[in-house]
Structure formats: structure tokens, C-alpha cells
Curated annotation (Swiss-Prot):
Name of protein: Elongation factor P
Gene of this entry: efp
A molecular function (GO) term: translation elongation factor activity
Upper taxonomic lineage: Bacteria, Bacillati, Bacillota, Bacilli, Bacillales
GO annotation terms (biological process): peptide biosynthetic process
Species annotation: Bacillus anthracis
Pathway of action: Protein biosynthesis; polypeptide chain elongation
Amino acid sequence: MISVNDFRTGLTIAVDNGLWQVLDFQHVKPGKGAAFVRSKLRNLRTGSVQEKTFRAGEKVEKAHIENRRMQYLYASGEAHVFMDNGTYEQIELGEKQIERELKFLKENMEVSIMTYQGEVLGVELPNTVELQVTETEPGIKGDTASNVTKPATLETGLVVQVPIFINEGEMLIINTGEGKYVSRA
């Protein structure tokens, strides 16, 4: 059990028959009445975000999430296959389960699989990934006004805004949290 006063971003808790990750929290001390903690939580099973208020000092159960290093192997229809590098055990995750992460996954990529009491919750990506540009308009020489961008389609199908000097075939570093261009690889 953990007190809501000890909340921090990224903490995983078990409340109301659900597993929740704390996205944001705020301690509130009104002029009248008892203090409370207002929090923004994301359900790890469904991905939905909800705001919940707790009384100050209230206790909640801390969920112990296990992260297993795995390698993304391939897609087989709606299923995506991952392999544990130590035990060579393979697991399949459905497209709905990893919908957001699919835009960044490519074969043989190392990821972290989050599990809770044997149940697979999802995929945790590295902060950045290297992806190749498969389609983009050619940059126009002399068009160098500040912060000019153009859309580029990457090898996974993700479309990002990139500077005009980026060409097809180049490797880019993409931030997985925001889905944005960082730099050339």
C-alpha cells in the first residue's frame, strides 16, 4: 500500500479493479475543508485517461509491473510476435493492444514488454528510434526560410514533419513519445 501523498509521475497503482499509471497529480489544500490529491490516470489495459480525486493520506495498492526485454520479430495478420532474448519464449500481441506503438516498431527491434501477474499489458518503446524515409517531396534549392517543413512517410507508415533538406532513403531519429523528428541518424 502507498499513500496518495507519495504519488509521482509514472507510478502504477491498482484502484477500482483496474491498473492505472499516474500521468499527472496535484496536491490541493483548499482554504476550507480537507486537503486532497487530484490526479490524471491512464488505464493500462484500455488506454483510457481519467481524472480521479483522492483524500489526502488515503492509501492505494501499488501495482508491481514487470518489464521484460524482448525483440519484435514479425507481424502475422492481426498478431505481432515478440521473443524473449533469454528464454527464446515467443508471445503474440493483438493489433488493438499495441495500436499506438505499431507506428514505431520494425523487425528485430528491442522493446520492453510490461506484464502484471503474468498478464501482458503492452509495449514500452525506447525514447527514440531510427527509421528510414520512404517517401517525401524533394527540397527546393534556395527555399531556406526559417523552420520550413514538409511531410515524410517513414518505413513503418508513420508520417512526420521534417526539414526540407531531408531526402528519400535517409535515416532519421524519431521521438517515440511525441512522434516527431529529432535529427538525422
